[in-house]
Regions:
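Thiol-based oxidoreductase modules, predominantly thioredoxin-like and allied folds used
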Residues: 99-127
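A short beta-strand-turn-helix
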Residues: 55-71
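N-terminal secretory signal peptides
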Residues: 1-8, 16-23
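Short active-site neighborhood of thiol/selenol oxidoreductases, capturing the structured segment around
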Residues: 69-82
């Protein structure tokens, strides 16, 4: 927690505390879900999912594996003591519709922004998780980096420039799912996320459907 205090403003800390309180509600909803949607709690208290990538931490290989399986590759950045990360696991990923969609369409690699594990970036350069986070300009958690379905020779393969989209912080379940749909549909080729989201909301309203209140 000391690292978090040093890097968060007073306003951000208050927001984090509020999110933690809200997470108690999310936890109740999550654990009402079937067993297969419950997260795995690690010894350090952090959460993960049984279906996240079991990786050798070589990004080119993880990317190619996802591609060969017809999926998109994404990195989920977390850190110890992060209330929004907890909410992501106990609420968002505990909703069957969301979990099933992501599992079917994405390979997710979970990393720690302060982690010391060795990892190989897309350009073949080795470094720690912490260094990769800095290289990718990841400063807050949770952050999700989404990558293209294929790299061309003109595509920069390092840092933030390698992404096609980014989820910069905690998104509520409806927005969370929509972001994954946006990436899967290559919506980033046509419009920014907020426009894609707006069209989805308008479409639901036009057909008399309510926005899910997860």
């Amino acid at each position: 927690m000391e690292k978090i205090r040093k890097r968060l403003s007073r306003r951000e800390m208050l927001t984090a505390i509020a999110a933690g309180a809200g997470g108690l509600i999310g936890a109740k909803m999550a654990y009402a879900a079937p067993e297969r949607y419950k997260p795995v709690q690690l010894e350090n208290g952090q959460y993960t999912q049984s279906w996240f990538l079991n990786s050798f931490l070589e990004l080119p290989d993880d990317f190619e594996e996802a591609k060969s399986n017809g999926k998109r590759f994404a990195i989920l950045w977390e850190q110890d003591g992060c209330p929004y990360c907890r909410e992501t696991h106990l609420t968002n990923l505990a909703i069957p519709k969301i979990s099933d969609y992501i599992r079917s369409n994405f390979d997710i690699l979970q990393l720690d922004i302060w982690g010391g594990k060795g990892i190989v970036d897309f350009d073949g350069k080795g470094m720690t998780e912490k260094t990769l986070a800095k290289r990718s300009q990841v400063r807050f958690t949770p952050t999700i980096q989404f990558f293209p379905d294929a790299f061309s020779s003109a595509t920069p393969l390092v840092g933030k420039k390698a992404e096609v989209a980014r989820m910069p912080g905690y998104f509520r379940p409806f927005h969370f799912l929509t972001m994954f749909e946006y990436v899967r549909a290559r919506g980033y080729q046509h419009a920014p996320f907020h426009q894609y989201l707006g069209k989805k909301v308008s479409g639901l309203k036009a057909t008399g459907k309510e926005i899910p209140k997860w």
